[in-house]
């Protein structure tokens, strides 16, 4: 994974602000992520259906590993937040390309 994250950090980054953060989740960490998904979903919608609850419960187990991308943008006089968010998107693309080049199957999803 070191190679993959090195590729991610080569994404365009105006002013070298380094806005991208990555969280790698696998194994038992997916249980905690499942709980976070359910808790957040309940906070956003108090009337979740059983189908929705099942979706959020099972989502982290669709893959053996999950990489979460976070854009931690900073105030800067010449670099607006949108450029920093796009930089994180480019880092995500580099992750996908690196994993593909290494022979891994992958997908980009949101729930």
Sequence positions of predicted segments:
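N-terminal amphipathic, basic helical "cap/leader" segment at the start of enzyme domains
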Residues: 1-62
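Short pre-catalytic strand/loop immediately N-terminal to key active-site residues, enriched for Gly-Thr
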Residues: 79-86
